[in-house]
């Protein structure tokens, strides 16, 4: 491998000749040989956006000239497109402020910009990082990445699953089945009503995420090192938020209090709480579906789900609810990530949180897993659900909880006696009620209509 020599304030470093990073990135590679978790590409993309926005803001305020702006913008466009992803090698387990990742971006954009300009025009600190600090750029990149990931990737997946549930609600209108509470038989419910509960869970948690996005669209940029805005020209914070908005097509604003924006990660904790709520709901939905599909002969068997692959290496013909299992594992991981995000966010000592890389790593993993998991769950399972009407009707009419319909006519205590007798003697509710003398056959038939109990 060929190398070139790069310098920083600590001296010279050998850097691979074909890489755009420089001395500080190389030092990080040598000092933090920990794990294989590369800084998320969503963060690299966000850095491309914020560095381009910062250059535009600095240009508007007369801090850089046209030539520098042009070179920076062109280099940033390559970062944004992902063309330069191979030049961002740093792991998550680095300085807690993300300083090395910020310098990685500064060095790559400067060296690529100089190559584009055909001369040594740009300096990583003096030009690419002008009016900025790692302490305000990394939190800004976190928010940009979080917003784009949720709005561009997660919301479309949620919307498709909601649409599928709406279709299933309509297709299954009029089908009445036994409800269940405590894993025990309960009063009747229509299959459409049950599905509507699943659908509304997704609608509610999407609404929670939309509320969380309000805080995530506030940017720390302009606070520099400790929130005071040292070395930042007047109007920079507002200008850079405007430029980020233009580049993303999303309305970002500058954070009202930069001291809070640097040391607290409230917005990410709040948003991840909504992701956790979504995961909890998906866990419940996937569990309901696999319970309802259990069988084929010894389970509930009230719905059919797609048969996607063989389920056992030893039991021929077995088919398992694999998409439900995958979805529930995703939910477990997201719920676990919430603990890491919350704990890391509590470590904002004095003017800066220094657990930011692990916060955004877990946050973006949660969004990615949920977006992909929901799409797979929808496409390979939920969209193919069909009702086993015969089994639903059989279970409904065998349910002892239908006795609840008799409460207004024979009273709670007599209804309980009827249910206990039917269960003990393995006879129908009708037979038990008549045998106990509470109603005649004609009276029973007149008042007992399970399909009307919903």
Give the residues covered by each predicted segment.
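Conserved, well-structured ligand/cofactor-binding cores
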Residues: 1-454
């Amino acid at each position: 491998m060929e190398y070139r020599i790069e310098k920083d304030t600590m001296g010279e470093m050998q850097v691979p000749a074909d890489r755009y990073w420089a001395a500080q990135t190389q030092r990080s590679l040598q000092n933090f040989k920990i794990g294989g978790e590369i800084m998320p590409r969503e963060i690299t993309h966000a850095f491309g956006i914020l560095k381009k926005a910062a250059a535009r803001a600095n240009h508007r305020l007369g801090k850089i000239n046209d030539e520098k702006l042009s070179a920076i913008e062109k280099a940033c466009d390559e970062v944004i497109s992902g063309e330069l992803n191979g030049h961002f090698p740093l792991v998550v387990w680095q300085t807690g402020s993300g300083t090395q990742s910020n310098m990685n971006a500064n060095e790559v954009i400067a060296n690529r910009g100089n190559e584009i300009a055909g001369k040594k025009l740009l300096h990583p600190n003096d030009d690419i990082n002008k009016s900025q600090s790692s302490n305000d750029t990394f939190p800004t990149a976190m928010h940009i990445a979080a917003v784009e990931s949720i709005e561009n990737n997660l919301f479309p997946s949620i919307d498709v699953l909601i649409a599928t549930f709406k279709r299933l609600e309509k297709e299954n209108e009029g089908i009445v089945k036994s409800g269940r509470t405590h894993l025990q038989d309960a009063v009747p419910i229509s299959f459409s009503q049950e599905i509507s509960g699943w659908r509304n869970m997704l609608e509610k948690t999407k609404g929670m995420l939309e509320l969380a996005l309000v805080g995530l669209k506030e940017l720390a940029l302009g606070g520099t090192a400790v929130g005071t805005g040292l070395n930042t020209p007047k109007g920079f914070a507002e200008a850079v938020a405007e430029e980020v908005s233009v580049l993303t097509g999303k309305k970002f604003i500058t954070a009202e209090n930069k001291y809070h924006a640097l040391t607290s990660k409230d917005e990410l904790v709040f948003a991840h709480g909504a992701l956790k709520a979504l995961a909890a709901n998906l866990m419940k939905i996937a569990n309901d579906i696999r319970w309802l599909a259990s069988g084929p002969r010894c389970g509930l068997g009230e719905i059919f789900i797609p048969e996607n692959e063989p389920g056992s290496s030893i039991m021929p013909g077995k088919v398992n609810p694999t998409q439900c299992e995958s979805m529930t594992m995703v939910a477990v991981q997201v719920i676990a990530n919430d603990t890491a995000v919350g704990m890391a966010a509590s470590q904002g000592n004095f003017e800066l949180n220094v657990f930011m890389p692990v916060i955004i790593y877990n946050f973006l993993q949660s969004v990615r897993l949920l977006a992909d998991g929901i799409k797979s769950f929808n496409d390979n399972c939920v969209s193919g659900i069909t009702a086993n009407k015969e089994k639903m009707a059989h279970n409904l009419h065998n349910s002892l909880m239908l006795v609840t319909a008799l409460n207004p006519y024979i009273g709670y205590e007599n209804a309980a006696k009827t249910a206990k007798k039917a269960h003990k003697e393995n006879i129908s509710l009708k037979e038990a009620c008549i045998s106990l003398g509470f109603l005649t056959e004609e009276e029973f038939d007149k008042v007992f209509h399970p399909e009307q109990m919903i």
